[in-house]
């Protein structure tokens, strides 16, 4: 019986390189690529979590949900997101983080689209909670990438660069959703 979790397996080791110059060149290029990908990727994933905060007023004004109901929906995301970050961090340590992160973003995007098909409170609470779970794939994969590619002495600097993604994502949310 096929194991669906094999998709997330970290894969076989690459062959060992002996040429020091080639190793240094490849390592430097890979590190730059890693920091750019995790920063841009997380920045683009962030709006999938913030979209509800932008559309709350129209939902209330349209009589679709009350402020209390939106509070329940929003709480579902944050409670499940917190738990997801905790548990998904353990999973990310042993997973192919490219696939793990991409799956989280893809499922989160699909959930955001699915929310437009219903105005039932319980459906929104469940979907927004699931969105929180899959959003919880993001930060752990970024942390794993940082710890795999940057030394203890460098992590603060590169974590600072990566943390720009939160602001980029928040700005993107208002650019894309608000108009």
Language model region names:
Residues 2-47:
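Cytosolic juxtamembrane N-terminal segment immediately preceding the first transmembrane helix
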Residues 127-166:
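Cytoplasmic helix-loop-helix junction between adjacent transmembrane helices
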Residues 83-119:
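Conserved MFS/SLC helix-loop-helix module at the cytosolic interface between two early adjacent transmembrane helices
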Residues 56, 169, 173-178:
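Small-residue (Gly/Pro/Ala) motifs that create kinks and tight helix-helix packing interfaces
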Residues 50, 78-86, 136, 170-171:
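Residue-level signature of mid-helix packing/kink "hotspots" within the transmembrane helices
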Residues 120-128:
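Short hydrophobic/alpha-helical segments at membrane-entry points of transmembrane helices
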Residues 33-61, 65-67:
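Extracytoplasmic
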Residues 58, 89-90, 179:
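Membrane-interface helix termini in secondary transporters
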């Amino acid at each position: 019986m096929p194991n669906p979790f094999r998709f997330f397996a970290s894969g076989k080791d690459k062959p060992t390189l002996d040429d020091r110059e080639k190793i240094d060149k490849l390592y430097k290029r890979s590190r730059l690529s890693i920091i750019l990908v995790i920063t841009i990727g997380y920045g683009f994933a962030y709006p999938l979590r913030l979209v509800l905060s932008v559309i709350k007023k129209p939902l209330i004004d349209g009589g679709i949900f009350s402020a209390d109901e939106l509070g329940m929906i929003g709480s579902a995301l944050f409670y499940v997101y917190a738990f997801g970050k905790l548990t998904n961090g353990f999973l990310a340590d042993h997973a192919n983080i490219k696939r793990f992160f991409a799956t989280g973003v893809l499922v989160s995007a699909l959930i955001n689209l699915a929310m437009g098909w219903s105005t039932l409170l319980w459906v929104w609470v469940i979907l927004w909670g699931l969105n929180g779970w899959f959003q919880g794939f993001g930060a752990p994969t970024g942390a794993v990438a940082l710890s795999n590619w940057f030394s203890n002495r460098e992590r603060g600097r590169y974590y600072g660069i990566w943390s720009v993604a939160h602001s980029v994502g928040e700005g993107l949310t208002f650019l894309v959703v608000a108009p």
